[in-house]
From Swiss-Prot:
Reactions catalysed: S-ubiquitinyl-[E2 ubiquitin-conjugating enzyme]-L-cysteine + [acceptor protein]-L-lysine = [E2 ubiquitin-conjugating enzyme]-L-cysteine + N(6)-ubiquitinyl-[acceptor protein]-L-lysine
GO molecular function: ubiquitin-protein transferase activity; zinc ion binding
EC number: 2.3.2.27
Topology within the bilayer: Peripheral membrane protein
N-myristoyl glycine lipid modification positions: 2
Keyword Lipid biosynthesis: no
GO terms for cellular component: endosome; lysosome; membrane
Key word Ligase present: no
Subcellular location: Endosome; Lysosome; Membrane
Protein name according to UniProt: E3 ubiquitin-protein ligase ZNRF1
Any single GO BP term: protein K48-linked ubiquitination
Zinc finger (RING-type) stretch: 152-193
Keywords for the protein's UniProt record, in alphabetical order: Endosome, Lipoprotein, Lysosome, Membrane, Metal-binding, Myristate, Transferase, Ubl conjugation pathway, Zinc, Zinc-finger
Length: 195
């Protein structure tokens, strides 16, 4: 019983031909953004400290870098370096890519409407903004609650007799102060956002 015994004939590396021993591949002097990390293996520093790599240009997918002129290596050891080509892989580690990803995704994910808080594609931004501004704000009747009526879904507190409430056209009721706060950000009923 118990776990499977490992055999000496089988490679312990996760992939055939790939060593899991960190000392098997010494860091190259050309890749200045890698440094030895003891038991953790090779670690990556911030992209801003990488010599020879310029920050990604706007519009470039994350993880792609331009190689600037590298005088430390005595000019160009390869034609790729002298042309300023894009690099992905050994020059752009996974850690570097993960640091850049949120900035790139945020720049390309669209626009957040300040009226309805929806995310809108850049090409639809103007039309959406006009539509949001021209959409009428919901009006409501304020009243004093005559009997207990359940829970306010905004603050999650009970609607008790004597509370000042707001009754929307869809007949939903909320604390008046809660719905006023809600309408500062949204223009719809919290329970019926598509109306």
């Amino acid at each position: 019983m118990g776990g499977k015994q490992s055999s000496a004939s089988r490679s312990r590396a996760p992939f055939p031909g790939v060593s899991s021993d960190d000392s098997a591949v010494p860091p190259s002097s050309n890749f200045g953004h890698f440094r030895a990390g003891g038991a953790m293996g090779l670690r990556s520093r911030s992209v801003s400290s990488v010599s020879g790599l310029d920050p990604p240009a706007p519009g470039l997918p994350f993880g792609l870098y331009r190689a600037g002129p590298d005088t430390e290596r005595g000019g160009s050891s390869g034609s790729e370096d002298s042309r300023g080509d894009l690099y992905l892989g050994s020059r752009a580690s996974l850690a570097d890519t993960l640091q850049i990803a949120p900035r790139w995704i945020g720049a390309h994910s669209g626009f957040r409407c300040p009226i309805c808080s929806k995310s809108v594609a850049p090409d639809e931004m103007e039309m959406h903004f006009i539509m949001c501004l021209s959409k009428p704000r919901l009006s409501y009747n304020d009243d004093v609650l005559t009997r207990d009526a359940g829970e306010c879904v905004i603050c999650l507190e009970e609607l008790s007799q004597g509370d000042t409430i707001a009754r929307l056209p869809c007949l939903c009721i909320y604390h008046k102060s809660c719905i006023d706060s809600w309408f500062e950000v949204n223009r719809c009923c919290p329970e019926h956002p598509s109306d």
